[in-house]
Regions:
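Adenine nucleotide-associated cytosolic modules
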Residues: 1-149
Length: 149
């Protein structure tokens, strides 16, 4: 771990349950976040701040004015922009070392399965039951840990 990383993640490293080994695991981890709205916004930002190595964020929606009071990752400057691109910019601002992969689509079927296979964990921040069920099925099929918000 580099000196700058030791400074950035020092508070994590001090925790007995994390330490240097745990932080190294976070830096090497890959997470898929489905949904970049009200729940996905803080999730993405905290994952980036924690030092997750790669965050794939999937959402097919654009930033609207009505989103701004609850979707903290987006701002007035991003109105009309794809949420995943706004998310990428926001995560880069808090941690430029995190690799962000924007997926501007509603994941389903084989595309969802391929994304789930490519990560260590999935965080479901979507807003509809059909997608939640599909995510759950893909995670069960691939034995990928799932956190549902």
């Amino acid at each position: 771990m580099q000196d700058q990383q030791l400074l950035r993640y020092g508070r994590h490293i001090l925790l007995d349950d994390i330490g240097v080994e745990g932080q190294d695991k976070l830096l090497a981890s890959r997470v898929l976040v489905v949904g970049a709205g009200g729940l996905g916004s803080p999730v993405c930002l905290y994952l980036a701040c924690a030092g997750v190595g790669e965050i794939r964020v999937a959402d097919d929606d654009t930033v609207e004015l009505s989103n701004l009071q609850r979707q903290i990752m987006h701002g007035t400057d991003q109105l009309g922009e794809l949420k995943v691109m706004s998310a990428k910019d926001a995560m880069w601002r808090v941690n430029p070392e995190t690799r962000v992969v924007p997926l501007p689509e509603r994941l389903a079927g084989d595309a969802l399965l391929e994304q789930v296979k490519a990560v260590d964990a999935v965080i479901d921040c979507c807003d509809n039951f059909q997608t939640r069920h599909a995510i759950n099925r893909a995670c069960v099929q691939t034995a990928t840990p799932l956190i549902s918000g």
